[in-house]
Amino acid sequence: METKPARVRILDAAHELMLTVGLARATTKEIARAAGCSEAALYKYFDSKEELFVRVLTERLPRLTPLLDSLAAAPGRGTLEENLTEIARQAALFYEQSFPIAASLYAETQLKRRHDDTLRTMGSGPHLPLQGLDAYLRAEQAAGRVHPDADTYAAASLLMGACAQRAFAYDTTESGERPPVDAFATRLARTLLGGIAVADRP
């Protein structure tokens, strides 16, 4: 059987360890061991654990940012409801998979501060999807499909916030199950549209 390239093995191992033990406890040494390579080899491909974390988010999780970028670059394509439904679906899946990875950071204050500083230096962070959705809604506003008085940043915050909350808000319900992602995304998009869409427009 063909062996995967080292970079792929490292990303796979990092993804698995970050999901199972959390970002705070997934050391580069453990990741390298799980990938079957040395820690020095890991640093040939990734400058830091923070960079590895960002690459896991962008290459192993639902591709939320590319979706937002492509929609913002071509406003007027598809219907608003279709586009917002797909954004909500991808965002819900992204947060569902990323929340268990990042949650452990909040128990380690110094590690969290260092992590935030590194992401800031890299120009990355959890604010990017929010900014990306705001940019898309502003593009649609300029195209005449979002009401001119709509607060696009608030609308983006409502959608992304609901998608993020879905990752953990249902753990203590009787069933412990999240709402099915497709139905959740459809309802969320339709409700948001009721507040921002131009009347009688798609």
Predicted regions and their residues:
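Generic hydrophobic, amphipathic alpha-helix propensity
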Residues: 6-14, 31, 56-60, 64, ...
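Helix-loop "lid/cap" segments that line or gate small-molecule binding pockets
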Residues: 73, 88-96, 103-111, 191-195
